[in-house]
Amino acid sequence: MNQPIDIKKVFWSIPVSVYSTPSECIIKKQIKVSTTDPKELEEIRELLKHEKYYQEQEIEHIDNPEGRIKFKVQLKINVGLCKKDILNYRCKLKRAFFNCFVLIMRIRDQSGEGFKEMHIKVFNTGKLEIPGIQTDESLTQVLNLLITILKPIVGQDIDFIHDKCETVLINSNFNCGYFINRDKLYNILKYKYRINSNYDACSYPGIQSKFYYIPGLENQTGQHPPANEIHTASEISFMIFRTGSVLIVGRCDENVLHCIYDFLKKLLEEEYPEIGNHLNIIQPKKQNVKLRRKVINVVENI
C-alpha cells in the first residue's frame, strides 16, 4: 500500500462480521501482541469484551517482580470464525508474526458458486501478502475490498500501488496418468537429459529435480547453465512421484511455468515405455469417513 499501517489501531477498528453473513466481508482477524505493561494488558482484555467471539492463546507469561524481566506477556488473539474453525475437529494453534495482523476475507467466487475465503497478511510497512491467488481478477477483487474497508479507518488517501505487485511463488501440479518406476526415471533424468536430480526414497518419496530456465533461449533443456549465464537463469524445482503426480514449485511467471510443463509432458510421453510401471498398480483403498461431533455454543443477548 502507499502508506505505513498502525497495526494496533487498525486491527481493533476493523469490523468483523458474523460467520453466517452472506456477503463480502471480514469474518476473522488475528494478531500477536507482546507487552511489558500490565495496564496495556488490561486494555486489551477490555477491548476483547466487546467482541462476540474471540480466542486468546497465551504464548508467554512472565510475572516476577524480583527477576530481571519483571513482567512480560505474549498473546495470540483470534477474533471471529472461519471455515476451518467450524469444519476441523482439532484446530492446531499456530504461532503468529510480529509487526503484522491477519485477515480472513470472504469474497464471491467468480465461478458463481457461492463464496470463498482469502488469507491476507497486513504488515506495518504497508506490505501485503496474499497466498492462494489463482487469477489477476481475484487479486483485484481482494485488494479493492480491503481498501474499501480500510478507508474509513486509515483515511481516504490509502490505496495500493498498482506497479508494485510481484509473484513470490507459484505452485502447480498435474498427473501423467500412469504409475512411474522412479529408479529408471531418475537415471534417465540425470544421465540422458542431464538435469540436476536427487532421489532417496528413504528421505523423500519423489524425485527432486531442478530446471534452469534461460530467457531468450528457444530450446529449453533445463540443464545447469554455464558460469557466464547462471545469473540470468531462473531455478525452478519439480518433483515426480510414483503415482504419476508432478509438482512444480518456484518463483516464476506463467510463461516459464507453461514451458516447464510442456517439457515434462513431452518427456513423460516419450519415456513411457521405459518408466511406465505396468505391473505394480495398487488400487487405492476406500477410506471410511469418520464423522466427528463438534459442539458450538451460541450465546445471545450479551
Describe the function of each predicted region.
Residues 1-302:
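Intrinsically disordered, low-complexity polar/charged tails and linkers
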